[in-house]
Curated annotation (Swiss-Prot):
GO terms for cellular component: cytoplasm. It catalyses: pseudouridine(1915) in 23S rRNA + S-adenosyl-L-methionine = N(3)-methylpseudouridine(1915) in 23S rRNA + S-adenosyl-L-homocysteine + H(+). S-adenosyl-L-methionine binds at residues 73, 104, 123-128. Homodimer. The gene is rlmH. This is Ribosomal RNA large subunit methyltransferase H. It comes from Coxiella burnetii (strain Dugway 5J108-111). The lineage of its organism: Bacteria, Pseudomonadati, Pseudomonadota, Gammaproteobacteria, Legionellales.
Length: 155
């Protein structure tokens, strides 16, 4: 199963990259977790933030591999516990599906981007920094894998 995290932002603190990679490296090859980054548009005083959000959303969609199903992360999406996430991942794995998890920038994702999603997932009702969401997603995928395989990480 190929899992792509497609996210806005390339210039992030080293601990974000290290946190994501730490969980990605723990997963076996049949749970291939990759990060695809797109550059964030410049946000200056007076910038049209809606236009930036639309442009970034389109770049995210364009970066999704053709065979991959789109899952978007949005605070208004469905909140699930980790065992439910594990069930979803197990089902997609059984169906031999590749998925791409889209994480928008500070302004979020466009309605067009959300409409293309197979599922809209909320990590929390809280608003999280988009960079931190990458690490949380990677950890939750690793934890879900540990449930699927009865690995002791999830107790």
């Amino acid at each position: 199963m190929k899992i792509n995290v497609v996210a806005v932002g390339k210039r992030l603190p080293a601990w974000i990259k290290a946190g994501f990679q730490s969980y990605a490296d723990r997963l076996p090859r049949d749970f291939d977790l990759n990060l695809i980054e797109i550059a964030a548009f410049k946000r200056s005083k007076g910038a049209d933030l809606k236009k930036i959000m639309l442009q970034e959303s389109q770049q995210l969609i364009d970066a999704v591999p053709k065979e991959s199903e789109i899952i978007v992360l949005d605070r208004l999406g469905e909140e699930v516990d980790t065992p439910t996430l594990a069930q979803k991942l197990s089902q997609w794995r059984h169906e031999n599906r590749s998925i791409s998890l889209l994480i928008g920038g500070p302004e979020g994702l466009s309605a067009t981007c959300i409409d293309k999603a197979r599922w809209v997932w909320s990590l929390s009702a809280l608003t999280l920094p988009h960079a931190l969401a990458r690490v949380i997603v990677a950890e939750q995928i690793y934890r879900a894998w540990s449930i699927i395989t009865n690995h002791p990480y999830h107790r």
